[in-house]
């Protein structure tokens, strides 16, 4: 029986599939052949001889010591794009939150609850504090047009935004998914100069370290 240790909470919908194929999936299995993780940091983990592979239920693998795994012949795999729709929705949600003080307005409404006849006057007086710009007509810069970035760019167009995208390594598959209305730019500086909002959709690597630095922020 193939033994898999889960080091984070994994949906039963996933673990049940493994169990149906004869795998033992538990958080306390000794010397498993596989690890299934999400956020667990394995950089200080001493790997055992039986370990064959590590699977991450997510896109990035920065919490896995890839060099060590390569030396020991441990296969590492992830799930790129699995969280793309959820992340796309959260990006738009965060832009809406940044445009208007929605959370503050919720707390303010709670604060005037129970004030009866005073509420209409309080609303009229206080509502202007929570006004904000629409996303429609604003400029969004998307850095990285992969599984997540392409979805963010396409959805932002539906909100009436002008979308510029930067990705010198865009795959053919991503290009097919991307709307023709996304403006492609060749330099990050154009994203920084023209954007009201920026969505950064790249993995953290040595090449992306300090991609957004003091100079980039100063040019915004």
Language model: regions and residue ranges:
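Gly/Ala-rich phosphate-binding loop of Rossmann-like dinucleotide-binding domains
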Residues: 153, 157
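Structural/interface elements that position substrates and couple domains in central-metabolism enzymes
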Residues: 2-5, 9-12, 23-25, 84-86, ...
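An N-terminal-biased, well-structured beta-alpha scaffold segment characteristic
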Residues: 1-79, 193
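Phosphate-binding beta-alpha-beta segment of Rossmann-like dinucleotide-binding domains, i.e.
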Residues: 80-139
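N-terminal Rossmann-fold NAD(P) dinucleotide-binding loop
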Residues: 149-150
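Glycine-rich Rossmann-fold phosphate-binding loop(s) that bind the pyrophosphate
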Residues: 145-146
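Rossmann-like adenosine-cofactor binding region
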Residues: 40-45, 168-220
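Phosphate-coordination loops involved in phosphoryl transfer and adenosine-cofactor binding
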Residues: 1, 51, 136-139, 214
């Amino acid at each position: 029986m193939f033994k898999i240790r889960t080091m984070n909470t994994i949906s039963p919908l996933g673990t049940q599939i493994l169990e149906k194929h004869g795998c033992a999936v538990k958080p306390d299995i000794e010397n498993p052949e596989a690890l299934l993780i999400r956020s667990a940091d394995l950089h200080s983990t001493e790997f055992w001889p039986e370990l064959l592979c590590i699977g991450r239920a997510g896109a990035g693998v920065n919490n896995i010591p890839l060099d060590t795994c390569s030396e020991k012949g441990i296969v590492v795999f992830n799930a790129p794009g699995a969280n793309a729709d959820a992340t796309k929705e959260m990006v738009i949600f965060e832009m809406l939150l940044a445009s208007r003080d929605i959370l503050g307005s919720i707390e303010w409404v709670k604060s005037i609850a129970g004030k009866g006849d005073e509420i209409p006057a309080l609303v009229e007086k206080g509502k202007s504090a929570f006004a904000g710009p629409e996303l429609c007509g604003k400029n969004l810069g998307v850095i990285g047009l992969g599984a997540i970035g392409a979805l963010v760019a396409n959805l932002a167009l539906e909100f009436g935004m002008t979308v510029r995208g930067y990705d010198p390594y865009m795959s053919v598959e991503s290009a097919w998914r991307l709307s023709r209305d996304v403006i492609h730019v060749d330099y990050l500086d154009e994203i920084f100069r023209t954007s009201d909002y920026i969505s950064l959709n790249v993995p953290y690597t040595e090449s992306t370290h300090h991609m957004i630095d003091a100079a980039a922020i100063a040019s915004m």
